[in-house]
């Protein structure tokens, strides 16, 4: 996860304007899995409360790292990816619950959000960084092992079954948003007003300590967005790009083709999605980048009743 998200492809700024009376708040900041986080509570905590709160924040990130982090070789998801068994694999309650959500995201996105592209994506990145393209035979082999249909969730026994031994999961497209949702649940134990951000995915509740709405700037729109009790996630391709054979490729793969988005065919630069659920917004922002035009993406979002902001190469 660390390497995958490191170039903060989705840089979103929050403007926390200080009132003259220095409104009551407590701030937690740090870096986890190479990604900066910021948590703002609209209450002043005592020293002991702040110490305990920091401990619980660390535990949430440890939880994400130990279960969902593809870059941690000892995580649960990494162990599943290494397994080539076709027998049912027992899942932790946390991973099973999240995979059920992933199943919902995949269906809702009409297959445009596909968490089985990890191995294929790594193959492409390995070659693009070397200014080459993968051999067609190798691409065909990897593509055969992608697709959500190659996984089966048993909702009675809480197990996962691979229908192909080589299929792998990469949950990076939604797990940052999921972590932000978990941090939001934690914050709600202390106060109604809070702001959580991890690497560009944001969740807000109530108001800023000064009494105004939370003011958010997104790379997907020139507008300043004012959020209350909602989340925003942004996906974009303008920060990881490679020039190979007179074409510009990005780090996002089109699940329908298995090929990285190529600038001349995919003009969308950034997408922000607003929703109560940050994991859902995260997944849908990724899905919306795979459309071949801004209008096509907007039409799909309207049909799905999504609140979105999109910018393309025309900066429109």
UniProtKB/Swiss-Prot annotation:
It is an enzyme of class 2 (transferase). GO terms for cellular component: plasma membrane. Mg(2+) binds at residues 173, 282, 286. Its EC number is 2.7.1.180. FAD binds at residues 33, 71, 112-114, 170, 176, 253. A lipid is attached at residue 20 (N-palmitoyl cysteine). It holds the Pfam family ApbE. It comes from Chlamydia muridarum (strain MoPn / Nigg). This is FAD:protein FMN transferase. The lineage of its organism: Bacteria, Pseudomonadati, Chlamydiota, Chlamydiia, Chlamydiales. Its cofactor is Mg(2+). The keyword Nucleotide-binding does not apply. Belongs to the ApbE family. The keyword Zinc does not apply. It is a lipid-anchor. It is found in: Cell inner membrane. A lipid is attached at residue 20 (S-diacylglycerol cysteine). Gene3D superfamilies: ApbE-like domains. Keywords: Cell inner membrane, Cell membrane, FAD, Flavoprotein, Lipoprotein, Magnesium, Membrane, Metal-binding, Palmitate, Signal, Transferase. InterPro entries: ApbE, ApbE-like_sf.
């Amino acid at each position: 996860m660390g390497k995958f998200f490191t170039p903060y492809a989705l840089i979103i700024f929050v403007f926390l304007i200080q009132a003259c009376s220095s409104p009551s708040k407590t701030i937690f900041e740090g870096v986890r899995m190479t990604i900066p986080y910021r948590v703002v509570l609209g209450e002043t905590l005592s020293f002991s409360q702040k110490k305990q709160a920091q401990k619980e924040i660390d535990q949430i990130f440890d939880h994400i790292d130990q279960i969902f982090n593809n870059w941690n070789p000892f995580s649960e998801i990494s162990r599943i990816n290494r397994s080539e068994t076709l027998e049912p694999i027992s899942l932790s309650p946390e991973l099973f619950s999240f995979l059920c959500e992933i199943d919902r995201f995949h269906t809702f996105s009409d297959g445009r959000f596909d968490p089985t592209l990890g191995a294929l994506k790594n193959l492409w990145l390995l070659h693009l960084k070397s200014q080459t393209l993968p051999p067609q035979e190798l691409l065909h082999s990897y593509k055969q092992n992608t697709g959500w249909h190659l996984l089966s969730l048993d909702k009675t026994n809480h197990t996962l079954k691979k229908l192909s031994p080589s299929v792998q999961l990469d949950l990076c497209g939604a797990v940052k948003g999921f972590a932000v949702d978990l941090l939001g649940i934690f914050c709600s134990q202390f106060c109604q007003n809070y702001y959580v951000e991890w690497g560009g995915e944001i969740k807000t509740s109530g108001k800023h300590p000064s009494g105004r709405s939370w003011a958010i700037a997104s790379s997907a729109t020139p507008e300043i967005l004012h959020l209350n009790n909602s989340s925003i996630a942004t996906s974009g391709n303008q920060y990881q790009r490679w020039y190979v054979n007179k074409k510009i490729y990005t780090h996002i793969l089109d699940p329908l083709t298995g090929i990285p988005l190529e600038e001349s065919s995919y003009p969308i630069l950034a997408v922000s999605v607003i929703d109560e659920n940050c994991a859902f917004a995260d997944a849908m922002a990724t899905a919306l980048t795979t459309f071949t035009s801004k209008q096509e993406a907007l039409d799909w979002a309207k049909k799905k009743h999504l609140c979105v902001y999109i910018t393309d190469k025309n900066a429109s």
